[in-house]
UniProtKB/Swiss-Prot annotation:
Predominant place of localization: nucleus
Protein's GO biological process: regulation of DNA-templated transcription; subtelomeric heterochromatin formation; telomere maintenance
GO CC, alphabetical: chromosome, telomeric region; nucleus; Set1C/COMPASS complex
Spans of repeat WD: 24-63, 70-109, 212-251, 264-307, 310-350
Annotated gene: SWD1
List of residues binding DNA: 236, 266
Organism lineage string: Eukaryota, Fungi, Dikarya, Ascomycota, Saccharomycotina
Other facts: Present with 907 molecules/cell in log phase SD medium.
InterPro entries: RBBP5/Swd1, WD40/YVTN_repeat-like_dom_sf, WD40_repeat_CS, WD40_repeat_dom_sf, WD40_rpt
UniProt name for this protein: COMPASS component SWD1
Effect noted on mutating residue 264 to A: Completely abolished H3K4 di- and trimethylation and greatly reduced H3K4 monomethylation
UniProt KW keywords: Chromosome, Nucleus, Repeat, Telomere, WD repeat
Complexes and interactors: Component of the Set1C/COMPASS complex which consists of SET1(2), BRE2(2), SPP1(2), SDC1(1), SHG1(1), SWD1(1), SWD2(1), and SWD3(1).
Role of this protein: Component of the Set1C/COMPASS complex that specifically mono-, di- and trimethylates histone H3 to form H3K4me1/2/3, which subsequently plays a role in telomere length maintenance and transcription elongation regulation. COMPASS recognizes ubiquitinated H2B on one face of the nucleosome which stimulates the methylation of H3 on the opposing face. SWD1/CPS50 acts as an assembly and regulatory hub for COMPASS complex formation. Serves as a highly utilized surface for COMPASS interaction with the nucleosome.
Subcellular location field: Nucleus; Chromosome, Telomere
Length: 426
């Protein structure tokens, strides 16, 4: 049913509540990522395969790399370009690959390192720049895929600053600021948080450095409006900061807002994710064989508002489609993908105002004038008045009822039938 005809209180729910689907992936999911508009879900698998599912049918439609060139070890991260045409994948096979989904048979470009890749994110998709973290490296790498792939260390440019800086440990995670795309945030194995200002491939500047914990920083996320930063650490605590960057991108100010912990079970957290826009909610997956839930907190008050249940195993990666308001997470043991969605009951009275649901059949009583003949002249006059109303069937609405932009560019992925049949038969 058209979403505009649904119950507005159900449509505008800010987070899903019920497990609605389970996607069985025979190749065992390691990581996952929605396309920018939520039309597709990319799954990185344990054998190095990349499988893309259509979220309308919950069926695979594309397996990039059917003419060699696919990863040969588990995929560690996936990143979509804003238009949904390009994909970045990193893997434990020491390589990062760039895929053009209009020609998915083999990677468009790739670059290899000397150790496994922790993760990779877009820095500027238009210029084909990305940033990656490598196993047991003290600095992140900026990679340029515009021509022949080139990698450069994201290091402190000032030697005096470098000599006076204590050991930060190995770089584990990184993210790019959503409102200041030239600001790169890096987390290390010794709890340091470093902010870099990117000028060019060979020129970077460390503008702020702060030690927030003595343990590993496992995950960094920035809200869509750029005002909140959440940090998942191995000390069983998720820290939420208000982040402020000046107009010249030269100074950073962090203010601690909340700390999220499971004070009863002392659980660690596998993955964290903000909701859209102002990040009113924060969702996290729990670590441990006995923990099978996703926790959702309200970021303003720091209170737990929802626990998503239904999975029968530990959950790892998380992603949130804000168009359909669905959350997905992959299971640790089976590799299946669990989908939580907003369940909207059909509101048929929107189509027929006198519609009423009944629990059992009732005898219909005909009204006295229900089937009386209508004067043809009056009927014709009413039809003419209705025909005079102009109906625009071409102009698309810019925003849906949740405020998501409907006019963003979307790429349609061609279906790869042959590879899908081989995957399902394996």
């Amino acid at each position: 049913m058209n979403i505009l005809l649904q119950d507005p209180f159900a449509v505008l729910k800010e987070h899903p509540e019920k497990l609605t689907h389970t996607i069985e992936n025979p190749l065992r999911t390691e990581c996952l990522q929605f396309s920018p508009c939520g039309d597709y879900l990319a799954l990185g698998c344990a054998n190095g395969a990349l499988v893309i599912y259509d979220m309308d049918t919950f069926r695979p439609i594309c397996v990039p790399g059917n003419m060699l060139g696919a990863h040969v070890r588990p995929i560690t991260s996936i990143a979509w370009s804003p238009d949904g045409r390009l994909l970045l994948t990193s893997s434990r096979d020491w390589s990062i690959k760039l895929w053009d989904l209009s020609k998915p048979s083999k990677p468009l470009k790739e670059i290899r390192f000397d150790s496994p890749i922790w993760g990779c994110q877009w820095l500027d998709a238009k210029r084909r720049l990305c940033v990656a973290t490598i196993f047991e490296e003290s600095d992140a790498y900026v990679i340029d895929f515009s021509n022949d792939p080139v990698a450069s260390l994201l290091s402190k440019s000032d030697e005096k600053q470098l000599s006076s800086t204590p050991d930060h440990g190995y770089v584990l995670v990184c993210t790019v600021h959503t409102k200041h795309p030239n600001i790169i945030i890096v987390g290390t194995s010794k709890g340091w948080l470093d902010f870099y200002k990117f000028h060019s491939l060979y020129q970077t500047e460390c503008i702020h450095s702060l030690k927030i914990t003595s343990s590993n920083i496992k995950h960094l996320i920035v809200s869509q409006n750029g005002e909140r930063l959440a940090i998942n650490c191995s000390d069983r605590t998720i820290r939420q900061y208000e982040i402020s960057i000046d107009d010249e991108n030269s100074a950073v100010e962090l203010t601690l807002e909340h700390k999220y912990q499971d004070v009863i079970n002392k659980l660690q957290w596998n993955c964290i994710l903000f909701s859209n826009n102002t990040a009113e909610y924060l969702v996290a997956s729990t670590h441990g064989s006995s923990a099978h839930e996703l926790y959702i907190w309200e970021t303003t008050s720091g209170t737990l508002v929802r626990v998503l249940e239904g999975a029968e195993e530990e959950l790892i990666d998380i992603n949130w489609d804000f168009y359909s308001m669905s959350i997905v997470s992959n299971g640790f043991e089976s590799g299946n993908v669990y989908v939580w969605s907003v369940v909207i009951p059909p509101k048929w009275s929107a189509l027929a105002p006198d519609f009423e649901e009944v629990e059992e059949n009732v005898d219909y009583l005909e009204k006295e004038d229900e089937f009386d003949e209508v004067d043809e002249a009056e009927q014709q006059q009413g039809l003419e008045q209705e025909e005079e109303i102009a109906i625009d069937l071409r102009t698309r609405e810019q925003y849906d009822v949740r405020g998501n932009n409907l006019l963003v560019e979307r790429f349609t992925i061609p279906t790869d039938y042959t590879r899908i049949i081989k995957m399902q038969s394996s």
